[in-house]
Amino acid sequence: MAEKFEAFVSLGLANGRYKDFYDIYVLADRYNLDGMELKNAILETFSHRETGFDDIAAFEDEFTEDVTRQRRWRAFIKKKKALLKVEFEDTIQLLKVLLIPIVDAIYKDESFEKSWNKETKNWM
């Protein structure tokens, strides 16, 4: 998950790797996650690849509202015959709920001793 997150951050607005977004969505939908474990993995991956958290283009409105990107997302979902037929905006929204609190904890150099609950789709 950390590598997929780093990939879509480093690619910025040029990102066309819809599988990364989808895979993270599926993991958040299907599994409970340990916050500290995920935070440490993200921190290690971003540090190793020298990627910053300053600009996460995928979390900007212009990224999710782009009509071409939405069309490509629907084509990806159709071609993949995805089990979870989710809209692009809903996918990005879940990724924000999942990942922004971890990024905030990294910025503040704080621990993140929470658990992701797959049922509520939130940190507890």
Regions found by a protein language model. Give the residues of each.
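Structured mid-to-C-terminal alpha-helical surface segments
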Residues: 1-124
